[in-house]
């Protein structure tokens, strides 16, 4: 019996390049990906095929699908409705496929709230100017619709922290490399490759042992000094500052490179060392508890 697949949300502002990235991901058979064909009330663009790119339906048909609970999610966007057919997704998951949901942020929020077995990835544009350029490059939108899409993007981008991963789409090649590694790390593939995260952890361990032993010793000493009750003292005695530092730095270097970096450098020692130097200023060495991430920089 095949293992059940996973729902993989790849979401982000309109025009960020979801279709181009997904198209490239689908060429890698080891990823076991199946594209979920969405239902929409909008008119087909040139070259789009019904049942392949979208299920193009009337507003009445879409409304009936909502009433009959036939959609996993649905959303209205710039005058049109979009939704994900439940039956199609469930059939593919039971076949062992990982189903890509290429959906708008409103729809992704519904799935994250209501469904299980979901991996979520937010695709980010490098800049708003680049996003505008990509939308205009389609040559399918009026100026008013372009403005509406950009206005919506400004409201959607702050929601990126609700997703498991944030990936910048500065180029399709770089974004695909990042997402492929995420899927390997999350054990969604049949590939024998190991995630680059595993090698990253080894690099971080070496750098920490070479440069930050003094910091680790002082961190542990500070935590013990500030422990004022029995529970806090036990926690301080059990605290492994070296292990915690390696975990924080590895996760943050990986996260930051996915969001704003060249993924080909993720296992480059000089690159990792540079990232760690900046992160070390943000470690609170008077406390075991750290910020959940170092966003905002």
From Swiss-Prot:
One GO cellular component term: cytosol
Keyword Cytoplasm: yes
Ranges for domain Guanylate kinase-like: 5-184
Sequence positions that bind ATP: 12-19
Reaction(s) catalysed by this chain's protein: GMP + ATP = GDP + ADP
Cellular localisation: Cytoplasm
EC number: 2.7.4.8
Pfam short name (any one): Guanylate_kin
Keywords from the UniProt entry: ATP-binding, Cytoplasm, Kinase, Nucleotide-binding, Transferase
CDD domains per record: GMPK (cd00071)
Major localization class: cytoplasm
Residue stretches in coiled coil: none
Cytoplasm as UniProt keyword: yes
Family stated for the protein in its record: Belongs to the guanylate kinase family.
HAMAP family: Guanylate_kinase (MF_00328)
Task of the protein: Essential for recycling GMP and indirectly, cGMP.
Protein name per its UniProtKB record: Guanylate kinase
